[in-house]
């Protein structure tokens, strides 16, 4: 496995692989890897080569968010990549990614102003800008992203289409802890009491899925049922609960096919997200 920190060296390695007609699966991460990331790596191994990038992107954090405290453990991450058959770990620093007079950004007029985008101003501009750069540097064939960041997946798919990137975005299922909590690098922030309270988030998701399966169409009733579960936990403060069209992120009144049910909530000071998808509904 190659551990590369230089953009120039990463581009040269990719160029060599491409000259031998090798396909590339790419997993973008901010590090502090967990089983959710490793499931993406496993999916990426259908390609000839697998690249994992580790970069805590300052551009996608707001002024009062957790950039400085975001969990980091490079040595552990590199070992996990090595143990799981990754071919290249790319770890650039911010000085390389954003040169002194950096002034070019990728932004979007729609989709990014809903859900997390409405709450985290500038977040998706940071995400799109850094991923556009990574796509140019690493030239992947398929990019593997987790459904837990569902809005991000849709935003990036739109960027790929709009800017004619020659790659495919593959969305992979949410990976959960045994008790149901969606795996997240930020779970490490939770105290024992907060960790217990956080289960209300996944419980609200599972209840909503059950209601949809039982035929409930009224989104206001589903949202209220989710709200009731979350409000029972004193440590939880709801950021949003929404049911939206998965492609447009527009709110809907009645359940149909291709709907995203999404929750964001603060457990203590930690903001967690979770969601479910309604697909294949007849």
UniProtKB/Swiss-Prot annotation:
Keywords (A to Z) from UniProt: ATP-binding, Cytoplasm, Ligase, Nucleotide-binding, Pantothenate biosynthesis
Record-annotated active site: 37
Pfam families per the UniProt record, alphabetical: Pantoate_ligase
SUPFAM superfamilies given in the database record: Nucleotidylyl transferase (SSF52374)
Catalytic activity: (R)-pantoate + beta-alanine + ATP = (R)-pantothenate + AMP + diphosphate + H(+)
Ligand binding (ATP): 30-37, 146-149, 175, 183-186
GO biological process, alphabetically ordered: pantothenate biosynthetic process
E.C. designation(s): 6.3.2.1
Pathway in which this enzyme or protein is active: Cofactor biosynthesis; (R)-pantothenate biosynthesis; (R)-pantothenate from (R)-pantoate and beta-alanine: step 1/1
Alphabetized GO MF terms: ATP binding; pantoate-beta-alanine ligase activity
InterPro entries xrefs: Cyt_trans-like, Pantoate_ligase, Pantoate_ligase_C, Rossmann-like_a/b/a_fold
Enzymatic class: ligase
Oligomeric form and interacting partners: Homodimer.
Note: The reaction proceeds by a bi uni uni bi ping pong mechanism.
Family according to the record: Belongs to the pantothenate synthetase family.
Protein name in the entry: Pantothenate synthetase
